[in-house]
Amino acid sequence: MNRPPLPLAAHDRLIFALDVPGHDEAIAWVDRLGESVAFYKIGMELLASGEYFHVLDALAKRNKRVFVDLKFFDIPATVAGTIRRLSQWPVSYCTVHGWHAGMLEAAAAANQGDMRLLAVTVLTSMGRPDLAAMGIDREPVDVVVERALAAQAAGIDGVIASGQEAGMIRRATGPAFSIVCPGIRPGGPVGDDQQRTVGVAQAFADGADAIVVGRPIRLANDPAAAAAAIQAEIRAAVVQHRD
């Protein structure tokens, strides 16, 4: 059964990608950003430190929302067992790969908490040549929408997908499906390894529930001020979208 999108305040719609190697660096970033960020994504680099769940617990104790981005992909029983245990933690979002219907169904059935499962469709760093190298001679957007519909049918709560595809996903899946967009670039796309990017306002206009931002905050001279500026963009976009 699909869970509806999280009831997020505007301030909770900015997710900072906490791409750091360990606990101390993670907490230093949380302290540095203070009240400007209320939602954090923790991924594979932190997992390799052995301190992943210490960070998750520390974030929860600071009343921060947590997005576990580990892109689970295995046989259905293994993924189901992982989701069953992870759903007992204070986690808002969790990613699973969106390429195996049986695995998606098992993950959805195993989710026993309020956590929303997001299917990974096509990574934002990938373009058509990358898909062609995998034997898929199609445009990324076509694959993304197809995978989003398959995930929805399997009981998954939403997708993590490029803002370029958010509008098409929203039209295909309807309002009761979560869309989280990574690779967001304030002011519009720039040249880096995220190929399919959009700006903040465009992502929300096209139906995103939340956005993930990493480098534009992390590399800023004043990260907290950069996050606050993005929060202002989000508030304006959310108000405009509601109107």
Curated annotation (Swiss-Prot):
Record-annotated active site: K71
Recorded GO MF terms: orotidine-5'-phosphate decarboxylase activity
Protein name in the entry: Orotidine 5'-phosphate decarboxylase
Listed CDD domains: OMP_decarboxylase_like
Domain of life: Bacteria
Nucleotidyltransferase is among the record's keywords: no
Pathway(s) per entry: Pyrimidine metabolism; UMP biosynthesis via de novo pathway; UMP from orotate: step 2/2
GO CC annotations on file: cytosol
InterPro entries in alphabetical order: Aldolase_TIM, OMPdecase, OMPdecase_AS, OMPdecase_bac, OMPdeCOase_dom, RibuloseP-bd_barrel
Encoding gene per record: pyrF
Similarity comment text for this entry: Belongs to the OMP decarboxylase family. Type 1 subfamily.
Annotated positions binding substrate: 19, 41, 69-78, 124, 185, 194, 214-215
Subunit structure: Homodimer.
Catalytically driven reaction(s): orotidine 5'-phosphate + H(+) = UMP + CO2
Keywords: Decarboxylase, Lyase, Pyrimidine biosynthesis
Role this protein plays: Catalyzes the decarboxylation of orotidine 5'-monophosphate (OMP) to uridine 5'-monophosphate (UMP).
BP GO terms, sorted: 'de novo' pyrimidine nucleobase biosynthetic process; 'de novo' UMP biosynthetic process
Taxonomic placement: Bacteria, Pseudomonadati, Pseudomonadota, Gammaproteobacteria, Lysobacterales
The enzyme's E.C. designation: 4.1.1.23
